[in-house]
Curated annotation (Swiss-Prot):
It is an enzyme of class 2 (transferase). Homodimer. Residues 87-208 form the GST C-terminal domain. The lineage of its organism: Eukaryota, Metazoa, Ecdysozoa, Arthropoda, Hexapoda. Residues 1-80 form the GST N-terminal domain. Conjugation of reduced glutathione to a wide number of exogenous and endogenous hydrophobic electrophiles. The keyword Transferase applies. Gene3D superfamilies: 1.20.1050.10, Glutaredoxin (3.40.30.10). It comes from the Eukaryota. It comes from Musca domestica. Glutathione binds at residues 9, 50-52, 64-66. Signal peptide: none annotated. GO terms for molecular function: glutathione transferase activity. Belongs to the GST superfamily. Theta family. This is Glutathione S-transferase 4.
Length: 210
């Protein structure tokens, strides 16, 4: 099973942790985005959208990290796997957290941080305030249960761990958020592959403007 990825990418790391939790060995293929590796013809044949992560499982190509995470559990996980249980309400809550992470939390971070290294712009305090609103939302969600979507580790925790560790790696302090801090300490100890996730997150430091 080929996995095209970049360690500093939070979406890639969320898939790596999912595979680790399921005991799946991935054939990791480092794709050097900053050198245009994603635009090479051989990769475009696999993924014309030229994004990572991309998984190829016996000829079946799939991209978008949350889609890959769900696919891996549904194909290789246990029946009613706790990572993504079969109960519609439990799945719905996990999905809500996954979409929140992708479309609100990490997007808020990207809006604030990416212009600083892509366009060499100074940090925008207003964009940071908007990002803090998304952290407030996450803090509220995490006040309701032990983990992100209930009392056991799920795909939601793995995706959110990849994001929050990225924030920490680029010196964004989440310790002032009581429930995020409690949850973050917990998942760093309980999420399979958390150490590899942190090592990848630290590569984000290379993007911090000097």
């Amino acid at each position: 099973m080929d996995f095209y990825y970049l360690p500093l990418s939070a979406p890639c790391r969320s898939v790596l942790m999912t595979a680790k939790a399921l005991g799946i060995e991935l054939n990791k293929k480092l794709l050097k985005l900053f050198e245009g590796g994603h635009l090479k013809p051989e990769f475009l044949k696999i993924n014309p959208q030229h994004t990572i992560p991309t998984l190829v499982d016996n000829g079946f190509a799939l991209w978008e990290s949350r889609a890959i995470m769900v696919y891996l559990v549904e194909k290789y996980g246990k029946q009613d796997d706790p990572l993504y249980p079969s109960c519609p309400k439990k799945r719905a809550l996990i999905n809500q957290r996954l979409y929140f992470d992708m479309g609100t939390l990490y997007q808020g971070f990207a809006n604030y941080f990416y212009p600083q290294f892509k366009e060499k712009k100074p940090a925008d305090p207003e964009l940071f305030k908007k990002f803090e609103v998304t952290l407030d939302f996450l803090n509220t969600f995490l006040s309701e249960s032990k983990y992100a979507a209930g009392d056991s580790l799920t795909l939601a925790d793995l995706a959110l761990l990849a994001s929050v560790s990225t924030f920490e790696a680029v010196n964004i302090d989440v310790s002032k958020y009581e429930h995020i801090a409690r949850w973050y300490a917990l998942v760093k100890e309980t999420a399979p592959g958390a150490d590899e996730n942190w090592a990848g997150a630290l590569e984000m430091k290379t993007l911090i403007p000097k």
